[in-house]
A protein has these predicted regions:
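AMP-binding/adenylate-forming catalytic core of the ANL superfamily
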Residues: 211, 307, 341-425
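Conserved AMP-binding A3 loop
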Residues: 24-26, 123-147
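Conserved ATP/PPi-binding loop(s) of AMP-dependent carboxylate-activating enzymes
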Residues: 288-292, 300-329, 367
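Gly/Ser/Thr-rich phosphate-binding loop
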Residues: 209-213, 222-281, 295
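Conserved AMP-binding/adenylate-forming core of the ANL superfamily
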Residues: 13-43, 51, 55-57, 61, ...
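Flexible, low-complexity linker/hinge segments
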Residues: 103-122
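Conserved AMP-binding/adenylation subdomain of ANL enzymes
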Residues: 146-163, 170-210, 265
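Conserved C-terminal "lid"/linker of ANL adenylate-forming enzymes
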Residues: 360, 386-391, 399-401, 418-465
């Protein structure tokens, strides 16, 4: 299993899709190689970028195999992107679209292409989910995808007896890594696109044992009272800090959820909390490295990583080469600088705290926003909270935004914080809003804290605080 075509061809997995069809992974490998031959006839050449804006379906997997077989590069395009966002990504990568209807008719009549792509070839481009600037273009070679699939399968304890649901979008590392790990372990794979009702029904019907997703996804399943009792391990990404109780709620429903860590540059499922640990431990993002060849260090609070899952570099404008200068700025002596604040637990285990840019610097101390948000979420009627810091003449001051359908008594909220937090952590304002500004990504919806800071600055300027 040295490259992506072999990952499919040598897997014992059977893959079930939303339309009811079931295909072996080997069938998908054959069909993908036929699709590669058809794409060659359409003028695609080794190194060309293909824009893939597809749901989780068989076509998506065939085209991923086709890219690997022919040496094309798959550019993952979020299905929720607007036309302007698609045009920007396609322009920056020089990616070409695929005429899918013609391809469905054409590839069936083609002889499978003898794969020419190698494990060292560029394979897939993910976009980072930055909330303050244009997304960076993260390039992975086949090598990092396949090697990490094997490591993640081992780290999650997957085997051919397991049933894995692949529900996160394949256009992001969370979805693709969950899929490839299942292929590496020859699991039965249930491919679907998330809907709180139908996904819950499918988990019960297929007796899914493993599924990875965002905290919001599991929250919505639990709200629907989905039967999750078959889930022995669900890795969850912590994108919504207001859902701190998600692990305990899932346990009450018979499912084991556990925190993990990953990002596009090192892929999802880079580390995992012990599923046998208690709910408090499993609720903490981070965990133990899944690869024996991976390592981490913490420098001035920043998490830095090495390992076989590491990306090849950030793609340059135009898509043909790696931007060496941009890539080098994110490395320190061979260690990838994540931009995340973390704390060491042992040589193989760490706890993710926050994005360094999101950490509040208050009263001369670093404060994780979640520390204040947790107190605010104790208030009856407060569904969620986000806290940012605003620079004032007397120093940085915290400002809180809450989602409270029936409103919130700001004075009471501030007094509550004063009883439980040091004075410098107490928000100077607690503002109720209808929803947090956010940006979608293939890995989960992320709150735009930069916009919250602008809103906070405007609120303080208006109030004179």
């Amino acid at each position: 299993m040295n490259n992506v075509v072999e990952l499919f061809a040598e897997s014992g997995s059977t893959v079930r899709f939303d339309d009811g069809q079931e295909l072996s992974a080997a069938d998908l490998a054959d069909q993908g190689c036929r699709a590669a031959a058809w794409l060659r006839r359409q003028g695609f050449r080794t190194g060309d970028r293909l824009a893939l804006q597809l749901p989780n379906d068989a076509d998506h997997l065939r085209l991923l195999v086709a890219c690997a077989a022919a040496g094309f590069v798959a550019v993952s395009v979020n299905t929720r992107y607007t036309d302007d966002e698609v045009a920007d990504l396609v322009g920056r990568t020089s990616a070409r679209p695929v005429e899918l209807e013609d391809g469905r008719r054409g590839w069936r009549h083609c002889t499978p292409l003898d794969p020419v792509g190698t494990r060292d070839d560029p394979f897939v481009v993910f976009t980072t989910s930055g909330t303050t600037s244009r997304p960076k273009l993260v390039l992975h070679r086949q090598r990092s995808i396949v090697d990490h699939a094997r490591d993640a399968a081992g780290g999650f304890g997957l085997s051919g007896e397991d049933v894995v649901m692949a529900v996160m979008p394949f256009g992001g590392t969370f979805g693709l890594t969950s899929l490839t790990a299942a292929l590496a372990a020859s699991c039965r794979i249930v491919v679907t696109n998330f809907h709180p009702v139908t996904t819950g029904d499918l988990i019960a019907a297929e007796q899914v044992t493993h599924v990875n997703g965002s905290d919001d996804m599991f929250h919505r399943l639990l709200e629907q009272r989905a039967d999750l009792s078959s889930i022995r391990l669900g890795g969850y990404g912590r994108f919504n800090t207001s859902l701190d109780g998600i692990v305990g709620r899932a346990q009450d429903a018979g499912a084991v959820l556990t925190g993990l860590y990953g990002m596009s540059e090192v892929q999802a499922l880079f580390s995992l909390r012990d599923p046998a640990a208690g709910t408090s431990q499993r609720s903490r993002p981070g965990g133990t490295l899944v690869s024996s060849e991976a390592s981490y260090r913490i420098v001035d609070g920043e998490l830095q990583l090495r390992g076989p899952s590491l990306f090849a570099g950030y793609l340059a404008e135009g898509g043909a080469t790696v931007d060496a200068e941009l890539t080098d700025r994110h490395f320190d002596d061979g260690w990838f600088r994540t931009g995340d604040l973390a704390e060491r637990e042992d040589d193989r285990t760490f706890e993710y705290v926050a994005r360094i840019g999101d950490v509040l610097r208050l009263g001369g101390f670093l404060v994780a926003p979640a520390e204040i948000e947790t107190v605010l979420q104790r208030i009856a009627g407060v569904d969620a909270a986000q806290v940012v810091a605003v620079d004032r003449p007397d120093g940085a001051r915290p400002v809180a935004f809450v989602i409270a359908p029936n409103g919130v008594d700001e004075t009471v909220a501030i007094e509550l914080c004063g009883r439980h937090l040091a004075r410098y952590k107490v928000p100077v304002r607690v503002i109720a809003i209808d929803e947090f500004p956010s940006t979608p990504s293939a890995n989960g919806t992320k709150i735009q804290r930069n916009k919250l800071r602008m809103m906070a600055e405007a609120a303080l300027s208006g109030s004179g605080a």
